[in-house]
């Protein structure tokens, strides 16, 4: 047996050596991907954690990344380095008592480790910014989930929105995230879908009234559509505000991304 171990050990070590690189910390400033043969639009993707009930809606983030990749964009992912409002046990839909998580650390799961603190995001280095939904947008990027129309927006999120808007660079938001633009950008036009629940198809339809109360204009759109506010260069789509098949949500996000990229002029 000793002889067998002597023979096997070096071979095992050699076999595992190529895998070791996957355990190294990736460069935080590296783009997640760059699929264009020539420089395309540089897009900042802002996450709010990992998981629909207390962070980023993962399917939305993935759909955005797929459509950005297809559009030849270079993507860099950001998230605020702050504690989550709370942690939800996604098997029960209930808060996990005595547990806390960090928004940046959780968002890194979606970014495959390639993530940067939102405090380092400078609009001058990017052509557009996109915010996926998930309750993290209403809990970690703002207090909308608790305070509704009287909500406050995270100071770094507010800064980023104002910087991109001031520079006339496009901003994309989906699902519940349009409330961020409604709060920060005066008179902006956004959509979160329909304004009536319609038998449960639009369970969060009441959000439209809160958006109006914030001084924004709500525009009714279907789940596969995106609304483009040409004046403010803000593009929104309902995504998971609608109870529907995943491919419809994917298509709506595709419409949002397409319009954002077109507005960059790249």
Curated annotation (Swiss-Prot):
UniProtKB keywords: Acetylation, Mitochondrion, Transit peptide
Gene3D superfamilies according to UniProt: 3.40.50.880
Transit peptide start-stop: 1-39
Compartments reported by the entry: Mitochondrion
Modified residues (N6-succinyllysine): 201, 221, 231
Primary subcellular site in the record, as a coarse category: mitochondrion
A cellular component annotation (GO) from this entry: mitochondrion
Record-linked InterPro entries: Class_I_gatase-like
Superkingdom, taxonomy of origin: Eukaryota
Modified residues (N6-acetyllysine): 149, 155, 162, 201, 217, 221, 231
Family (UniProt): Belongs to the GATD3 family.
Name of this protein: Glutamine amidotransferase-like class 1 domain-containing protein 3, mitochondrial
Source organism (scientific name): Mus musculus (Mouse)
């Amino acid at each position: 047996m000793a002889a067998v171990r002597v023979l096997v050990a070096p071979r095992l070590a050699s076999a595992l050596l190529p895998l070791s690189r996957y355990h190294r910390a990736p460069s935080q400033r590296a783009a997640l991907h760059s699929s264009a043969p020539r420089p395309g639009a540089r897009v900042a993707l802002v996450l709010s954690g990992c998981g629909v009930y207390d962070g980023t809606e993962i399917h939305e983030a993935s759909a955005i990344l797929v459509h950005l990749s297809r559009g030849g964009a270079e993507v860099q992912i950001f998230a605020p380095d702050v504690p989550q409002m709370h942690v939800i046990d996604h098997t029960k839909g209930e808060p996990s008592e005595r547990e806390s998580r960090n928004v940046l650390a959780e968002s890194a799961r979606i970014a495959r480790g390639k993530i940067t603190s939102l405090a380092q995001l400078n609009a001058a280095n990017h052509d557009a910014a996109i915010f996926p939904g998930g309750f993290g947008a209403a809990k970690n990027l703002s207090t909308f989930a608790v305070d509704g129309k009287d909500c406050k927006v995270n100071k770094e999120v507010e800064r980023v929105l104002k910087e991109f808007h001031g520079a006339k660079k496009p901003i994309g938001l989906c699902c519940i995230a349009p409330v961020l633009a409604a709060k920060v950008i005066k008179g902006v036009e956004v959509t979160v879908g329909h304004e009536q629940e319609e038998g449960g198809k639009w369970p969060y339809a009441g959000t439209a009234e809160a958006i109006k109360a914030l001084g924004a204009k709500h525009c009714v759109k279907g789940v596969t559509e995106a609304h483009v506010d040409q004046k403010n260069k803000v593009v929104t789509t309902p995504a998971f505000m609608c109870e529907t098949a995943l491919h419809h949500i994917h298509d709506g996000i595709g419409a949002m991304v397409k319009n954002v990229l077109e507005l960059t002029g790249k």
